[in-house]
């Protein structure tokens, strides 16, 4: 099941990258609007109609608007969280301090860029 979850994350990352150009032309006013639209469109198999994550997967979100960065943190059954960093057109996924998805090959360790972020838990 863990491999399936990681595969889902990679599919989500690919979907975000592929949809970026389309959404840029779609008239969305802000970066945050565009990001949340993509995440909603690409994660229907993870998130139920009520907005909560299914299958015991907890989804946390932090948006750092001033830096135009969005960090998504997925906690999977007590394992080390997977941190997905979106910066403009660059998307990176890190787990256990190792990059597991980096399409442009530009990040040695994205953890060092995340100096602080607040985790907001769905209730």
Over which residues does each language-model region extend?
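Short intrinsically disordered terminal tails
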Residues: 1, 121-123
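Active-site nucleophile-adjacent alpha helix/oxyanion-hole segment immediately C-terminal to the catalytic cysteine
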Residues: 1-49
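Conserved active-site-adjacent core of cysteine acyl-enzyme catalytic domains
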Residues: 28, 38-105, 110-115, 121
């Amino acid at each position: 099941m863990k491999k399936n979850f990681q595969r889902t994350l990679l599919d989500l990352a690919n979907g975000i990258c592929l949809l970026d150009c389309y959404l840029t032309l779609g008239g969305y006013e802000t970066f945050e609007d565009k990001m949340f639209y993509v995440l909603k469109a690409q994660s229907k198999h993870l998130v139920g109609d009520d907005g909560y994550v299914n299958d015991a997967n907890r989804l946390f979100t932090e948006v750092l608007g001033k830096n135009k960065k969005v960090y998504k943190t997925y906690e999977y059954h007590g394992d080390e969280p997977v941190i997905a960093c979106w910066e403009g057109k660059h998307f990176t996924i890190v787990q256990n301090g190792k990059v597991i998805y980096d399409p442009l090959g530009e990040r040695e360790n994205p953890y060092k860029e995340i100096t602080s972020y607040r985790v907001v838990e769905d209730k």
